[in-house]
Amino acid sequence: MKANDSYRLKIGLTLNNLAREMMTYHVGDRIPAITELVERYQVSRGTVQSALAQLCSEAMTLKKSGHLGSYITAINHRKIWEYTGWNTLIGAMPLPSNNSLKGLATALTTSIEYAQLPFNMAFMQSAQNRVNGLLAGRFDFVVVSRLSADVCLEKNPQLTMAVELPRGSYNKSHVIAFSNPKETRLRDGMRVAYDPCSYDQTQLTRLCCEGLNIQYFHMPYRSTLHCLEHGGVDAVIYLKESAARSTHRLGMAPIPYEDPLSKAIYAVLLTSKENY
């Protein structure tokens, strides 16, 4: 490869990396110092300066404030996107089966479309399936609960939490639902269904059933409630909002574990460090 070609390749790759980083910045933000970017991208100072100059000529404006650094005074994320090397932004989230998820789906779609970015959202049940898609490079981000995120990040250090949304952004609460409307607690010998691919349901089920002699049944998340309604199992951990809409008379009891239960109601966006 000729020297000029090698230099242009370095400029191009640095421009991709810088544009991807700038996608997370907004007006008023201070950008990293040149020396910091040189160390991060492992290229020369001149290469970073050339890439930054290209972005500033077409997509953003900086104000230099001496030793305080440079601040963004204007930025066109749609134009920045053109330099990222990315195509359509693809996210994945659960089916919007409750009011929290319906609102979240609308908010995410509206926000990204407002930025004029090419975008598609895939709706897919179970955090494990969504995270597997993220790890395989099929998705750029996935929506899971904070409870699921903790499990995913421990298992997959290449993932990172990009955004944590407010309380109630994922759902309102889970309950223990019983096929017997008079039942109020889990007991030895009960049949309990859960989806092993649903980190929330799995963790809450195991926690609630700890110390009890329980017969477990594995099935897709949405099938657990259907199975409960028709007497196939005695209990499931399910979203209170969805269980309350059941046309069958079900018993319901609160989950007596505040910490994991509270983490299950926060929505989190996970991304891969290897994608940026």
Give residue ranges: language-model regions:
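Periplasmic-binding protein-like
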Residues: N76-R78, V163-S179, R249-Y276
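Short helix-initiation/N-cap motifs at beta->coil->alpha
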Residues: M121-N132, Q215-E229
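A ligand-binding cleft/hinge motif common to bilobed small-molecule-binding domains
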Residues: V143-N156, H226-E258
